Each structure stands twice: as C-alpha cells, then as structure tokens.
C-alpha cells in the first residue's frame, strides 16, 4: 500500500493547491470589478483630452509647441506599464514581446531606445535582457495615484524637452473584456494628429488667454499624464482579469488532476487487494 499512500498524499497536495487558486480567483474577480470602475471613471477624461489635443495637432496654431513638431528620430523612449505581481497568464510576456519587436525595428534603423518602467515585472525583465532602463516605479498597489506615477513621466518629458528623445510612447495592455486584453504601443510625443475624419474636416480657431506658451505647456503635460494614468488603470484591470482566468484554469486543471490520481489510486488499491486475496487463496490451497 506504499504506492497508494503516496498517491493519497499527492491528491491531498493538489486539493490544498486547488483551494488556494480558487481563493485567488475570487479575490481577482472582486479586484477586477473595482479596477473596471476606476477605468470607466477615468476613461471619459482621457478620451476628451485626446480629442482636444487632436484639434490642436490638426490646427494652424500661432505658437508651435515643441510637442507638436516632428523631429529626425535618433532616440525613442517608452513608458512601459507592467504588473507588480505574477500569476496573470501571458499578460506581461505578450506585452514585452510586442515591445521588443518594436524596439528591434527602431534599432535596425540605428535608433537608440530608453525605457521608463512602471511595475516590477517590467523592471526585472528588461534588466535581465539588457534594456536601457532610465527610470522606474514599483509597488503601486491596487489603487495607483498620479503622484506615484509622476516620477518616470517627468524623467521622460525632461529628456524630450532637452532633445535627448525624439519620440515618446506608452506601452500597456488595453482592457477589452474579461477574456481579452490587447498589448498596445501608443505614441504620446510628438502629438499625433487626430484620425477622426470629422475633426479633419472642421477648422478650429483658438484664442489663448493669457499666453499660448504657458497654456500649451500645462495642457500638453496634463495630456501626457492623463494618457499614462489611463494606461495604468487599464493595465490593472487587465491584470486582474488575466489573473482570474489563469486561476480558474488552474483550479479546473487541479480538478482534472485529482480525478486522474483518484483513478490511479483506485487501481493501485484494487491491485493490492487482489494480491492479498491471491496470497490467501494460495496459502489455503497449500494447506
């Protein structure tokens, strides 16, 4: 029965793990709903800012802000949003693969890349592969604030202001639904012109008070900050959804494994009983 005892021990171990994954699935489901609420609350502001900036990028402005001007590209920067925790399926690695492919495309053109990381998984991954990480922030928890994110944003904006970066992108997962999260790379600077046909057909005239430079400096920085914050809350909702799905799959796989082990245990026990009966019958026949 040594084999049967070993199998019983494995079954108990899988059952304990199954309880943990089931609990993590339920926690992730609860956190996902809260993350979706935050994402839905901030999305209108981010989208409105994007529309306003789209008007500016399409317009003929009396003052041309540096954030609106295309440059010869020698260095590009990425604000990379990843998770602080694992156990969320392929969410991070799919994002990193997309980013590495984009970085390689720039590298083949002789363009250098700098990375500002939001989330510990991105920090550890790109440090291990030799990425040029110039800023990082980790441990933001389940309710990140803009003040926690502002460090890497300031570093990249300062580099852009000083001409050390010619393009700036944000890299994050876009939440579609519980089963679908899409890795995206979105250009922040220089500001891309709006792709909305209605905006392209509309002529916009702006009056600036008191000064266009001061107003645009503030507005365009707010735009970048809003897009980064939206990327973070969308990535957080994606993380919880991916973790919930991964933990459900682990729980289901645990159930299947328990059934297989139970079948093996029953066969081992049956074989042991058969052997004992055979020995008893053989002994009786010998007598």
UniProtKB/Swiss-Prot annotation:
Q: Which gene encodes it?
A: atpG
Task: Say which domain of life the source belongs to.
Answer: Bacteria
Which InterPro entries does the entry link to?
ATP_synth_F1_ATPase_gsu, ATP_synth_F1_gsu, ATP_synth_F1_gsu_CS
Q: Where in the cell is it found?
A: Cell inner membrane
Keyword Membrane found: yes
Organism phylogeny: Bacteria, Pseudomonadati, Pseudomonadota, Gammaproteobacteria, Enterobacterales
The UniProt entry's GO CC annotations, sorted and at most eight, read:
plasma membrane; proton-transporting ATP synthase complex
| Keywords assigned by UniProt, alphabetized | ATP synthesis, Cell inner membrane, Cell membrane, CF(1), Hydrogen ion transport, Ion transport, Membrane, Transport
* Subunit and partners: F-type ATPases have 2 components, CF(1) - the catalytic core - and CF(0) - the membrane proton channel. CF(1) has five subunits: alpha(3), beta(3), gamma(1), delta(1), epsilon(1). CF(0) has three main subunits: a, b and c.
Record's function text: Produces ATP from ADP in the presence of a proton gradient across the membrane. The gamma chain is believed to be important in regulating ATPase activity and the flow of protons through the CF(0) complex.
- What is the designated name of this protein? ATP synthase gamma chain
PROSITE patterns this protein is in? ATPASE_GAMMA
Q: How does it sit in the membrane?
A: Peripheral membrane protein
Record-linked Gene3D superfamilies: 3.40.1380.10, ATP synthase, gamma subunit, helix hairpin domain
């Amino acid at each position: 029965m040594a084999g049967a005892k070993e199998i019983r021990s494995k079954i108990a171990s899988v059952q304990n793990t199954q309880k943990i994954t089931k609990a993590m699935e339920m926690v992730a489901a609860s956190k996902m709903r809260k993350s979706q609420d935050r994402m839905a609350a901030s999305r209108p502001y981010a989208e409105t800012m994007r529309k306003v900036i789209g008007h500016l990028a399409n317009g003929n402005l009396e003052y041309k802000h540096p954030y609106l001007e295309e440059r010869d590209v020698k260095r590009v920067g990425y604000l990379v949003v990843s998770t602080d925790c694992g156990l969320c399926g392929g969410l991070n690695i799919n994002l990193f693969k997309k980013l590495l492919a984009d970085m390689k495309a720039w590298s083949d053109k002789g363009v250098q890349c700098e990375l500002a990381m939001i989330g510990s998984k991105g920090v550890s991954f790109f440090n291990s592969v030799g990425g040029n990480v110039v800023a990082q922030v980790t441990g933001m928890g389940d309710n990140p604030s803009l003040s926690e994110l502002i460090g890497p944003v300031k570093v990249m904006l300062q580099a852009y202001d000083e001409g050390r970066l010619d393009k700036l992108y944000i890299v994050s997962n876009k939440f579609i639904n519980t089963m679908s999260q899409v890795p995206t790379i979105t250009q922040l600077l220089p500001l891309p012109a709006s792709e909305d046909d209605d905006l392209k057909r509309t002529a916009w005239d702006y009056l600036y008070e008191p000064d266009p430079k001061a107003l645009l400096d503030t507005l365009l920085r707010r735009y970048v900050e809003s897009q980064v914050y939206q990327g973070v809350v969308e990535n957080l909702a994606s993380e919880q959804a991916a973790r919930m799905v991964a933990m459900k799959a682990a729980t289901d796989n645990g159930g299947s494994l328990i059934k297989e082990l139970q079948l093996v245990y029953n066969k081992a026990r049956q074989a042991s009983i058969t052997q004992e009966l055979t020995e008893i019958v053989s002994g009786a026949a010998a007598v």
